Amino acid sequence: MRLKNLTFIIILIISGELYAEEKPCGFPHVENGRIAQYYYTFKSFYFPMSIDKKLSFFCLAGYTTESGRQEEQTTCTTEGWSPEPRCFKKCTKPDLSNGYISDVKLLYKIQENMRYGCASGYKTTGGKDEEVVQCLSDGWSSQPTCRKEHETCLAPELYNGNYSTTQKTFKVKDKVQYECATGYYTAGGKKTEEVECLTYGWSLTPKCTKLKCSSLRLIENGYFHPVKQTYEEGDVVQFFCHENYYLSGSDLIQCYNFGWYPESPVCEGRRNRCPPPPLPINSKIQTHSTTYRHGEIVHIECELNFEIHGSAEIRCEDGKWTEPPKCIEGQEKVACEEPPFIENGAANLHSKIYYNGDKVTYACKSGYLLHGSNEITCNRGKWTLPPECVENNENCKHPPVVMNGAVADGILASYATGSSVEYRCNEYYLLRGSKISRCEQGKWSSPPVCLEPCTVNVDYMNRNNIEMKWKYEGKVLHGDLIDFVCKQGYDLSPLTPLSELSVQCNRGEVKYPLCTRKESKGMCTSPPLIKHGVIISSTVDTYENGSSVEYRCFDHHFLEGSREAYCLDGMWTTPPLCLEPCTLSFTEMEKNNLLLKWDFDNRPHILHGEYIEFICRGDTYPAELYITGSILRMQCDRGQLKYPRCIPRQSTLSYQEPLRT
């Protein structure tokens, strides 16, 4: 009985595995890359894709796949796309002060190593004279830096956060913890962080900043608002499509602490194109294009022994196909004549009479090759075209020359029919077409084309008052976008859309946008002065709209607000405040029977916001009987420090005295 039950369970499990529905893969959104345009246009036709289907994706200029390549394939699996179609920004050669880099590259691919060294008296981030770092998907494995050797570390001013101690100077190997205010994050992207004092400074410089999201690329056939260089956590961007296009995806995306969510949408055409045509059962078509324009016609034929019912033509109209015909099996039995004769070959006859659907095969004599299908079929009284037998004596000479490319494995004197060569393009040239060319009967099939890259011309940029938004390699691949920005003091014409600043490389040519000088309006006069602080930027009589100045407080004063003020439409933004420190009064401490709890609090200045702790002298206790000892911990507030009061134990109070200041 137990064996029966076990067998039944095994059958259930196996049947469950056999009939489990395979989960298809949805439309992939390639971060910093793209797939072929027709997938975007006919998204609903191609997706979801079935298991084991493959899809190629390409990376934008300045980005590579995780394996360091510009193009890669991903496969649909039961777990989704594998590998995940993502493109990562190449690592740029760092601007290294007090050190050197051993090679002359400007950009490094993912998984590529770079060696750097430091000058005398300076150390790498690992405390060594030389170090090797690797380009990873999120940047360098550690940021190449040469830091001066130190014996102590000074805790920097911490805005929007607090240290766990009031101590300011730390010895090597000392550690300190700090916490950031709501909405701000540590240098490591956390709410709290512990840093260590090393010989070259802090392991990670303490700071609290708002997380930022990467800039957004322009979408094809659409635009978004607002456009910024960088976005902070909480920023929302809305997408719009041009006329005759609609959004596929959410029109609103938001910057979170983990990046943008949801992914950017795409703009798809409404009516101008049709997907591949519907194919009735037992039919075939002659063309196999991926897209069809409005008004295009496709001819449909029925398979052998089937008759067409309805129009053999269907038309693309407003994004939809007209009604296709049906192919119905014919009832009439029609015989064919004897199979046709061919030179230098013969048919393999197996009957005297042949009807609809009957087939006959051919073979060639020795020394001849069969050209065409080796099989013909009787179709309603007529044979399909027979093959030809061609003498097999033609070899191919040198393969065709490809400009800016070459045969990968060297060139032979001659090539036999059926052999092939593989082409590769020169560095930065994009291969279009099949990379394989085959020798067939003395002729080569069409070779690929190597499309020229673009070289950005500095003279043209200076002439048009523009500069590159991002750092690129010396060449930009055909089809990739180059983002420009206007130089400071220049702007696009009011009638020119912002999309003109994003230019596509087209076979070595770049159409440079033109920026003109801004009108002189919105200028500011001298920036406002602040109490207990100074302006450390160089000063001028007038300031352009958008320019800024930086402030610094006097020693021991606490800077509150932004340390920079900006000129906006003729007015300065609010400058920072410099809050006064507190001075410890031993006279007040004596009056109130107080002692310092910690020796390190015996200092001339206590910064705004810092705490200082007291204890009562012997045989005294806090005057406020209902309050615990925590009242003896006081905070400096804009130069004012309140002192608690301790009274002798034999005294009694008939009333509660206020705190003295």
Swiss-Prot record:
Alphabetically ordered keywords of this record: Blood coagulation, Disease variant, Disulfide bond, Glycoprotein, Hemostasis, Repeat, Secreted, Signal, Sushi
The cellular component terms of Gene Ontology attached to this UniProt record, alphabetical and capped at eight, are: extracellular region; extracellular space; transferase complex
Indicate yes or no for the key word Repeat. Answer: yes
Q: What is its main location?
A: secreted
Outcome (variant: I101N): In FA13BD; impaired interaction with F13A1
Motif Cell attachment site located where? 617-619
Sites carrying a glycan are N162, N545
Q: What is the effect of changing V237I?
A: In FA13BD; uncertain significance
Q: Name one GO biological process term.
A: blood coagulation, fibrin clot formation
Task: Report the outcome of P448S.
Answer: In FA13BD; impaired interaction with F13A1; impaired structure
Q: Where in the cell is it found?
A: Secreted
Manganese as a keyword of this entry, yes or no, is: no
Q: What Pfam families does this protein's entry cite?
A: Sushi (PF00084)
Gene3D superfamilies documented for this protein = Complement Module, domain 1
Q: Which InterPro entries match?
A: ComplSys_Reg/VirEntry_Med, Sushi/SCR/CCP_sf, Sushi_SCR_CCP_dom
Which residue intervals define the domain Sushi in the entry? 24-88, 89-148, 151-210, 211-269, 272-329, 334-391, 394-452, 453-516, 522-580, 581-647
Disulphide bridges, residue numbers: C25-C76, C59-C87, C91-C135, C118-C146, C153-C197, C180-C208, C213-C255, C241-C267, C274-C316, C302-C327, C336-C378, C364-C389, C396-C439, C425-C450, C454-C505, C486-C515, C524-C567, C553-C578, C582-C636, C616-C646
Where does the record locate the signal sequence feature? 1-20
Q: Which PANTHER family match?
A: COAGULATION FACTOR XIII B CHAIN, COMPLEMENT FACTOR H-RELATED
Which purpose does this protein serve, as stated in its record?
Answer: The B chain of factor XIII is not catalytically active, but is thought to stabilize the A subunits and regulate the rate of transglutaminase formation by thrombin.
How is the subunit organization of this protein annotated in UniProt? Tetramer of two A chains (F13A1) and two B (F13B) chains.
The illness linked here is:
Factor XIII subunit B deficiency: An autosomal recessive hematologic disorder characterized by a life-long bleeding tendency, impaired wound healing and spontaneous abortion in affected women.
Q: What is this protein called?
A: Coagulation factor XIII B chain
Q: Which organism is it from?
A: Homo sapiens
